[in-house]
Amino acid sequence: GQVMLLPKDPSTPVIMVATGTGIAPMRAYIRRFFVEDIPSWNFTGLAWLFMGVANSDATLYDDEFQECVKRFPGQFRVDYALSREQNNKKGGKMYIQDKVEEYKDQVFDLLDGGARMYFCGLKGMMPGILSMLEGVCKEKGINYDEWLEGLKSNGQWHVEVY
């Protein structure tokens, strides 16, 4: 649906957060940005994928993503949260919200600059994501409810979970 449409401005940074089969639309975005030749839409922004899976054997399309990292080093990055192989800063399992939190300053700077953030995958990731973002807002002295509402009203917040 319209919830997951890409920005019209091809210079807009895009932060993608996916778990499991939620990688499907993110892969389509990445292919649109870096593989398909679309003269009318030449992506010039940053595309940053956070992918949460149980272990490295479950990193779908990693070969494609690593090729994009090599071909577009300043424009594409991918970070994995491997819950059965990595630990978070508290020593627990590394979930998607923990991986995003590792880069909280960069993520917040990008969002402050107009980046779009897309979430797709298991609905169980969203409570952890929202709780983490609320904690980061508190650390930064930001009113969380106003901040999140601002992202939504500015068209920067896109969620498709199931």
Predicted regions and their residues:
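Reductase modules of NAD(P)H-dependent flavoproteins
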Residues: 1-5, 34-162
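Active-site beta-strand/loop microenvironment that shapes enzyme catalytic pockets
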Residues: 9-35, 125
